[in-house]
């Protein structure tokens, strides 16, 4: 619970939906890898905090129902498709107030483009940049990672200002020095679990 749900709650805080959200018109949320550990938590938290529509993206057909069970208003399955972003755009024609992305180079630029004015892109991982092997990395794996790093999309500061968009990134290592923040997060998470608003299984 602490690492997975803590990651999700901090992402929601960076998106300004917790502990209290501003009364903005657009409260649409897009969650990548929405059937995974952090993603499923983000979907549940977004619904609990009054976001909507909450749109989840999954990578396989068998994950669609799991994402819906977490409360997603719409689920986009990208397996074997090149046009899945069209479905993402159609689910929230005015763009998204927040997009949560742990994919890395594969989706970052398009995620940024899908933000509404004042929208926030929250980045907490780069799993498409990493090799999917458990053994020693080969020279090919290192080359692939280098190519991914070189392909990272640039984000122009002037564009951030003109569009009123923002980008936030984090990893949990900073939690070690923020015990008060961790205590606040744990109190909220346990309250949601006790109220049946957050499923951790």
Where are the predicted features?
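Terminal helix/beta-alpha structural elements that buttress the NAD(P)+-binding lobe
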Residues: 1-201
């Amino acid at each position: 619970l602490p690492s997975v749900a803590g990651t999700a709650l901090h992402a929601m805080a960076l998106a300004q939906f917790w502990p209290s959200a501003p009364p903005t018109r657009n409260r649409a949320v897009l969650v990548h890898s929405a059937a995974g550990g952090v993603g499923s938590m983000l979907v549940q938290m977004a619904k609990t905090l009054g976001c909507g529509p909450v749109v989840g993206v999954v990578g396989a057909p068998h994950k669609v129902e799991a994402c819906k069970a977490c409360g997603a208003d719409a689920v986009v399955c990208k397996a074997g498709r090149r046009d899945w972003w069209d479905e993402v755009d159609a689910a929230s024609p005015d763009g998204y107030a927040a997009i949560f992305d742990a994919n890395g180079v594969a989706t970052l630029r398009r995620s940024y483009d899908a933000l509404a004015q004042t929208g926030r892109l929250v980045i907490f991982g780069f799993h498409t940049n990493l090799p999917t092997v458990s053994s020693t990395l080969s020279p090919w794996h290192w080359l692939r990672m280098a190519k991914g790093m070189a392909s990272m999309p640039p984000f122009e500061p002037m564009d951030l200002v003109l569009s009123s968009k923002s980008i936030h990134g984090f990893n949990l290592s900073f939690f070690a020095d923020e015990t008060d923040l961790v205590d606040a997060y744990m109190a909220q998470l346990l309250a949601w679990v006790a109220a049946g608003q957050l499923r951790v299984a």
